Amino acid sequence: MATNKSIKSVVICVLILGLVLEQVQVEGKSCCKNTTGRNCYNACHFAGGSRPVCATACGCKIISGPTCPRDYPKLNLLPESGEPNATEYCTIGCRTSVCDNMDNVSRGQEMKFDMGLCSNACARFCNDGDVIQSVEA
């Protein structure tokens, strides 16, 4: 019985991460002025809102090229972005809400491996695909 719960939990987490990681594809075509606008846009779009509606509601722009305008910086890890802690907070929030729920299901060796994969997925999501390797013993 516990094995079925573990499998169900892992499957649900994989599905949720799949949905979250799919949003990264969309994020590259929207630019927001600040973290609040980016979070608003992501939440709106994740809830099913269309890109143009979410962009208008959150003060963001939809672009066709790969570069955001200067007054609409993209959330990233560059020091000049002015928001270096935003990525760290994103990663912490993702790990807390998604990965910790997986950890509560089972504490076996396989789950530790899955937790590592979940943490890496959160890092990729929050860093817009640029993964910074963590040093963990």
UniProtKB/Swiss-Prot annotation:
Keywords from the UniProt entry: Disulfide bond, Plant defense, Secreted, Signal, Toxin
Keyword Transferase set for record: no
Compartment annotation: Secreted
A GO term from the CC aspect: extracellular region
A GO molecular function held by the record: toxin activity
Gene3D superfamilies named among the record's database cross-references: Thionin-like
Signal peptide: 1-28
Prodomain positions: 75-137
Highest taxon listed in the record's lineage: Eukaryota
InterPro entries: Thionin, Thionin-like_sf
Annotated disulfide bonds: 31-68, 32-60, 40-58, 44-54
SUPFAM superfamilies on file: Crambin-like
Keyword Nucleotide-binding: no
Swiss-Prot/TrEMBL GO biological process terms: defense response
Family the UniProt entry places it in: Belongs to the plant thionin (TC 1.C.44) family. 4 C-C subfamily.
Function: Thionins are small plant proteins which are toxic to animal cells. They seem to exert their toxic effect at the level of the cell membrane. Their precise function is not known.
Identification of the protein by name: Probable leaf thionin
Naturally occurring in which organism (per UniProt): Hordeum vulgare
